[in-house]
């Protein structure tokens, strides 16, 4: 293969890489079914492993604060920020149906899974503090840093 062929192959590989990167970067958090295994089942399994016992009740309690269904596509925090700025009525609808609260709670749960201890009482305390956040005043873009700070206070 000559130099021109190598350059073309590298260019094609680069374009494929960029396409795949953009696809996965912009993909929504899927909360639908993975066969018979939902996104919430995966979170429950991870939390079970972290805490050392069945956590399905806690998942139901903290991720379903307004008894909204645990299925469907959940918008990312950056999508919620864009909605709040560009379509306030749609954002308000998502606040009212509990979708925004679920997105915040899932982010909190993922933060706990990465950084938290295996103490159940500390987990409950942390999630109760997150549930008491005023959603209208939460800076979604800095939520992860705020959660890490809150988590450091509960450890």
From Swiss-Prot:
It is found in: Membrane. Keywords: Membrane, Transmembrane, Transmembrane helix. GO terms for cellular component: membrane. It is a single-pass membrane protein. The chain crosses the membrane at residues 5-25. The keyword Membrane applies. This is Uncharacterized protein 061R. It comes from Invertebrate iridescent virus 6 (IIV-6). The lineage of its organism: Viruses, Varidnaviria, Bamfordvirae, Nucleocytoviricota, Megaviricetes.
